[in-house]
Amino acid sequence: MWPGIAEFQNVNTIGHTDSQQRWKDAIDCGSKYGDKELLHINRQGKYNEFKICMEKKGYHRFWPAECGYQNPKWDTGKCNL
């Protein structure tokens, strides 16, 4: 499975989202750098606020099943780190 942060993809570059820019945006939206599973915002009960903030910045959140797995055999090409 892909980490939670990888499920957020820039709508203009799905599958090739700039990781550094996504981290900057995620931090602006309340996440902590390096928290790939988004545990910090989940523990604070702010996941929905985070998701809305990321959408306003031009991201689409894919469900884990839409991303597939990091294994190339099962990767759908929609998510990246």
Regions found by a protein language model. Give the residues of each.
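Mitochondrial intermembrane space
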Residues: 1-81
